[in-house]
Amino acid sequence: MHRNNKRRRRRRAVFGTCIMFIGSLLLLIGGVTMVMRNWTTSVQAAGNPYGDGGWQLMLVNRWHPIPENYAPELTELWNGELVDSRIYPDLQEMFDDARDAGMEPYVNSGYRTHQLQQLLMDREIADYISQGYSEEEAKEIAEQWVAPPGTSEHQIGLAVDISMEDTSDQNASDVWQWLRENSYKYGFILRYPEDKTDITGIGYEPWHYRYVGKEIAEDIYRQGICLEEYLK
């Protein structure tokens, strides 16, 4: 009888140990599931930096900085300027058609490094200081025209500043008019329209065009909106 009691106690102990092990395992699995669920939620909450439409819809402005370590593959143009290689074919087609229409456009500024963007910002601030503004005032005004480093579309290679070979005001005006009316056909949009400065955070720049893809560019053009409004 005493021996039977011992056996029963051993069986209970073994059974209890098994129950504890199984319980711990279930808790562990549940914890991992919860961690994975939380991780997935965090990723979804953080959002896709490329937007729902892929890389060409990446939103970059003072409220949406460039993703860390973003490094596009670049193509060098004839004048040494660089652009994201994926936009080059459509950019070239747009310029070819503009030339057929009597224009002579070229990319005055394409991809910029962080250091170059900082240099441009520093120069802009210094220029306003030389006009008598305080450093704080100069910085505030400069940021209306030059995006702070880390928030410029030029740093992702999808934006181009377009000028004319003949830099007279009339010729520049003609090419910008042509671009306003036709750039969407090639996947580009006027990025900083005159009536959207309160939304984009940047002053009107008739020379600054951004690649978003042909279908989306046409949607934006037809609706008369800016990229921020499209992505809402």
What would you call each of these model-derived segments?
Residues 2-232:
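Extracytoplasmic cell-surface/polysaccharide-interacting catalytic and binding patches
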